[in-house]
Amino acid sequence: MPHRYFTTEISDGTAVLRGADAHHLSRVMRGKLGDTVILCDGSAVEYTATITGFGDETVEFSVEPGYPSAAEPTVDVTLLVGYPKQDKLEQVIRHGVELGCDHFIPFFSRYCVAAPKKEEQKNERYNRIAFEAAKQCGRGVLPDVALPLPNFGAVCRSLDRYDLVLFCYECGGAPLRQLLAEAKPADGEKLKIAIITGAEGGFAAEEAEMAAKAGAKTVGLGPRILRCETAPLAVVSAVMTLTGNLE
């Protein structure tokens, strides 16, 4: 199977790969003239590309006409995740990309145990993890990780951009299947779904009320208690299954 790389430098039947990926292809993989790879432009379009030349830190290609990526789901999913301790957020990002998430937005809430520290530096690492996961699993877009929102109020103020907001709460709520069936996307657009899950301490009752007032639909996650790094992935898996994106 051809190796996959992301580049935005694709036009008029040619393409250029630069930086670390160019080094990987030319020095690590020992690519040769005439070898074929798959290039992705980050907007769900892929190209079959043939190596035509090497520069100091570049690889040049001729490319065939682009075609839609088969790996992209029919829904646009954003994970809003209560900021967890240690490397749990890295796990959520890595596996969330594999499952089809497009956006990740960490946030701090009342019962978060983790405290803000070196967030810009961490954000660079998180986006790199998303980038590598997207390459590994064959995604046609580059999922992004935002800087964390400072409190749950900021989360609620950001929710009007979505067609469906799922607030995951231990007190339960409406069936997920029903909520997905009732949600309607804008004409010609993917259904935009936001999934909100808590950190280790869960949510305060006031935060659940804030989410409901902001239009979020409360959903339960079954009779078992899920860890904060398990819950978001469980919901994403359920959403992808119910929308036909894991078939």
For the regions a protein language model found, what residue spans apply to each?
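N-terminal positively charged helical leader segments and presequences
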Residues: M1-P68
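A generic structural signal for short beta-strands and their flanking turns/coil linkers
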Residues: G13, L33-D35, V45-Y47, E57-V59, ...
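Glycine/charged-rich beta-loop-alpha catalytic/anionic-binding loops adjacent to active sites
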Residues: A15-L17, T74-T78, K190-A194, A212-L221
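Hydrophobic side chains in well-ordered alpha-helices
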Residues: L25, L89-V92, E207
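RNA substrate-binding interface of SAM-dependent RNA methyltransferases
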Residues: A70-F167
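Active-site/ligand-binding-proximal alpha/beta "capping" segment
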Residues: Y162-A208, A216-G220
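Structured adenosyl-cofactor binding patch, chiefly the S-adenosyl-L-methionine
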Residues: A205-E247
